[in-house]
Amino acid sequence: MDKRILKLRQQIDELDEEIILLLKKRMGISKEVGKLKEELDIPVEDKTRENEIIDRLTQQAGRNLSEEQLIRIFTAVFKSSKQIQHWVTTSKQTNIFW
């Protein structure tokens, strides 16, 4: 294998590790949001917030990430976050995924 490809793949692997750490951190915060939503009797689903996030991130994405790609990625992130929040609001357990 060409050394240049290996070097680039190594960079991708390092970024993947950073993404995992950030996703874990995001899901931990989502868990806390779920607890507060339960306490305040606020629904988990908040399409307005999701649209605000997509709009903000679309402006930041630039040329290497299309709006369609960004929406697909963050739809999955939102789905996972909402699953955690639903889990927190329907269960008294507090140890999910970590």
Model regions and ranges:
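Domain-level signature for soluble enzymes in the chorismate/prephenate branch of the shikimate pathway
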Residues: 1-98
